[in-house]
């Protein structure tokens, strides 16, 4: 079964790897790639999406840039994690094609309207673009099958003690998304911190004789630098965003539970917190499938096997 998807991302090392993972699988049909500000500034995340698609020879996929700042707040970026370009590490090509002359919301609406089947939205950055789409195009809600997002946590945060970065950047947007009534799969820190890539996994990737695998290995080399800080307690580096695509491809790798999730938009201490009612204490109806567990080795095998797809036949087919 094929699934039509739109990837809304803020590349970002793990966003780039999520995109590479998705495009290795013909059962995922990418209708568009849209970009948000987050890991870097909006001009850089848009350019990075174009560079990755150029690397993959996928200039056929329409790309559009989205909101330049959160709905009501000033922009926060994570350049301390992703470097000056947002994709520091490998030498990436300059874009060979241009973005669409419309906004991310307009492109998403256009593609959803034209799609012959329901569309799955896969946001891996702040949820500003998705919230704007849902607010401005309520008539398209029935054509959105699911939102599979990277964001939030039932446990501790990674940007503040209570909040994960993507939700913290634009909590008002996240609030709109989680209240939309559209089915949601939440890939939060509870599961993404289990999706750690180790040094030996990077060497497996480096041993794959194609340029895409080499690029991913170099992305991971840089991504590892930030995550080696002992304060995190990691052995490797957590691949947050690829968990969204891995769940679409192999949901059996994950342990999940349907929960009610609320977004804190006001508190000084817990702004951006995803309040996950794992034990049904509120009596509220579940609005998200929350991922809690992962077969890490199966996840790494999926990534490695997917990177083998990028042989010369794939890269020269267009």
From Swiss-Prot:
The active site is at 240. Pfam families: IU_nuc_hydro. Keywords: Glycosidase, Hydrolase. SUPFAM superfamilies: Nucleoside hydrolase. One of its GO terms (biological process) is pyrimidine nucleobase metabolic process. InterPro entries: I/U_nuclsd_hydro_CS (IPR015910), Inosine/uridine_hydrolase_dom (IPR001910), IUNH (IPR023186), Pyrim_hydro_RihA (IPR022975), Ribo_hydro-like (IPR036452). Its EC number is 3.2.-.-. It is an enzyme of class 3 (hydrolase). GO terms for cellular component: cytosol. Belongs to the IUNH family. RihA subfamily. Hydrolyzes cytidine or uridine to ribose and cytosine or uracil, respectively. This is Pyrimidine-specific ribonucleoside hydrolase RihA. It comes from Shewanella baltica (strain OS185). The lineage of its organism: Bacteria, Pseudomonadati, Pseudomonadota, Gammaproteobacteria, Alteromonadales. The gene is rihA.
């Amino acid at each position: 079964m094929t699934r039509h998807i739109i990837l809304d991302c803020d590349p970002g090392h793990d966003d780039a790897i999520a995109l590479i993972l998705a495009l290795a699988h013909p059962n995922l049909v990418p209708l568009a790639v849209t970009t948000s500000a987050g890991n870097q500034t909006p001009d850089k995340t848009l350019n990075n999406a174009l560079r990755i698609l150029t690397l993959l020879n996928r200039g056929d996929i329409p790309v559009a840039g989205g909101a330049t700042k959160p709905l009501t707040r000033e922009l926060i970026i994570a350049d301390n994690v992703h470097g000056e370009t947002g994709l520091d590490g490998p030498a990436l090509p300059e874009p060979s094609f241009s973005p669409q002359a419309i906004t991310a919301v307009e492109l998403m609406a256009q593609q959803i309207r034209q799609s012959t089947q329901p569309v799955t939205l896969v946001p891996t950055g702040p949820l500003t673009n998705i919230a704007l789409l849902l607010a401005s195009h309520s008539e398209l809600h029935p054509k959105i099958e699911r939102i599979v997002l990277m964001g939030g946590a039932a446990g501790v945060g990674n940007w503040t003690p209570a909040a994960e970065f993507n939700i913290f950047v634009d909590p008002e947007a996240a609030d709109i998304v989680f209240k939309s009534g559209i089915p949601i799969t939440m890939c939060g820190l509870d599961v993404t911190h289990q999706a750690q890539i180790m040094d030996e996994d990077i060497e497996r990737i480096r041993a794959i004789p194609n340029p895409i695998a080499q690029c991913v290995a170099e992305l991971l080399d840089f991504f590892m630098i930030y995550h080696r800080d002992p304060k995190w307690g990691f052995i490797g580096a957590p691949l947050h965003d690829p968990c969204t695509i891995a769940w679409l491809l192999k949901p059996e790798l994950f342990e999940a539970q349907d929960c009610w999730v609320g977004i804190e938009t006001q508190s000084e201490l817990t702004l951006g917190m995803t309040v996950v009612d794992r034990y049904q204490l509120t009596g509220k109806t579940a609005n998200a499938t929350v991922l809690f567990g992962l077969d890490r080795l199966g996840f790494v095998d999926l990534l490695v096997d997917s990177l083998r797809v990028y042989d010369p036949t794939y890269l020269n087919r267009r």
